[in-house]
Amino acid sequence: MQDVVQAYYGKELQSTADLKTSACCDADAVPDWLKPLLARVHPEVSSRYYGCGLVCPPLLEGCRVLDLGSGSGRDVYLLSQLVGASGEVVGVDMTPEQLAVAREYLPFHAEQFGYANVRFLEGQIERLEELDLEPGSFDVIVSNCVLNLSTDKPAVLRGIQRLLKPGGEFYFSDVYVDRRLPEAVQSHPVLYGECLGGALYWNDFLRMARGAAFTDPRLVSDRPLEITEPQLAALVGEARFYSATYRLFNIPELEDACEDH
């Protein structure tokens, strides 16, 4: 399915107008404090944004942040402003066409912000150990509607846990579903590219997160998704999809429930 994803995001989609569902459209209201920062991101970068939520947690100044599946770089350039000149943001993506857009506007954003604190790496999020990324070196790792596109989600979570500093967090938005999906939906190229075919069944995700030592997943927000194209809606049947934002903390000694000893 990686070839399908690369082709869909590298060649099929040229802007958000080409999307066929609301899964990869950010319907979350942009908070007022973030609007001026978003306005400083180049329009060409923003037009190729396919996220499903906001992955800009507060209090990032001076932090080292990694964005998995960074695409055209919109979130990277937002985060660049939040971490400031003393921080760093690294984007990882496997799609050359998306990376080309992100890298083309590196000089533009460095001039806009008054500093250069961003770099982009080409690679697969399931194989982060192959990239020039030091274990235990990131304060925060983010991703936006990306984990569902992976064919080996446990490997992604293990790689994230390996790269986070003790006490660091994985702050991410993704697509979830209220049941396990049949093979016909999982393997459908458009549904997969639209972030639905690989959507995480809620309970499978929670088990997966705990298996990667993220013992207490915290839900930040969620919203239902709409499938307006009749043929696609018929394929998914009664399944209900949601965009949700979670926080996973790298605290190995953390218990899996709130306790009062």
Predicted regions and their residues:
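Short, glycine-/aromatic-enriched active-site segment of Class I SAM-dependent methyltransferases
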Residues: 176-196
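A short SAM/SAH-binding and catalytic strip from SAM-dependent methyltransferases
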Residues: 139-152
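A short glycine-rich, Lys/Arg-flanked "PGG" loop and its adjoining helix->strand segment in the class I
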Residues: 154-169
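A short acidic, Gly/Pro-enriched loop at the edge of an enzyme's catalytic core
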Residues: 129-140
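Conserved alpha-helix/loop element of class I SAM-dependent methyltransferases that forms part
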Residues: 28-64, 78, 82
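Short alpha-helix
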Residues: 198-213, 219
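Class I SAM-dependent methyltransferase SAM/SAH-binding core
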Residues: 60, 64-68, 76-128
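C-terminal lobe and adjacent flexible extensions of AdoMet/dcAdoMet transferase-like proteins
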Residues: 212, 218-224, 229-261
